[in-house]
Amino acid sequence: MKEQKIRVKLKAFDIELIDQSAQSIVASVKKTGARVSGPIPLPTSIRKVTVIRSPHVNIKSREQFEMRIYKRLIDIFDVTPQTTESLKKLALPAGVDVQLK
């Protein structure tokens, strides 16, 4: 029989928020007796946008903004029904995107 595994991917703009969410997921899963691997930090995506500062004059004057997307990966092994229930009942902050596979 194949071992059951849940892969949790977290994405957020705030690094403190994503780390708190990852720690709460790991703590709730460990209480149910499942094995946890992670949180594994994935590469941070950086999106840069360059805009012109003034609408008419000084066309060479530009300003750059960046948006950083932080990602974490958590693998959960030996999944029990209590583990899935604890993941369903877990309340995470609004700024964190969660994907379960």
Curated annotation (Swiss-Prot):
> Which ranges form a coiled coil?
none
Q: Which HAMAP family match?
A: Ribosomal_uS10
What keywords would UniProt list here?
Ribonucleoprotein, Ribosomal protein
Q: Name one GO cellular component term.
A: ribosome
This chain's protein is named Small ribosomal subunit protein uS10
Assembly mode: Part of the 30S ribosomal subunit.
State the protein's purpose.
Involved in the binding of tRNA to the ribosomes.
Tell me if Ribonucleoprotein is a UniProt keyword of this record.
yes
By its UniProt entry, which InterPro entries does this protein fall under?
Ribosomal_uS10 (IPR001848), Ribosomal_uS10_CS (IPR018268), Ribosomal_uS10_dom (IPR027486), Ribosomal_uS10_dom_sf (IPR036838)
One Pfam family from the UniProt entry? Answer: Ribosomal_S10
What is the disulfide pattern of this chain? none
Q: Does the keyword Flavoprotein apply?
A: no
Give the molecular function GO annotations: structural constituent of ribosome; tRNA binding
Gene Ontology BP, a term: translation
**Record's family?**
Belongs to the universal ribosomal protein uS10 family.
Q: Do you know which SUPFAM superfamilies this protein is assigned to? A: Ribosomal protein S10
Please give the superkingdom of this protein's source.
Bacteria
Q: Which SMART domains match?
A: Ribosomal_S10
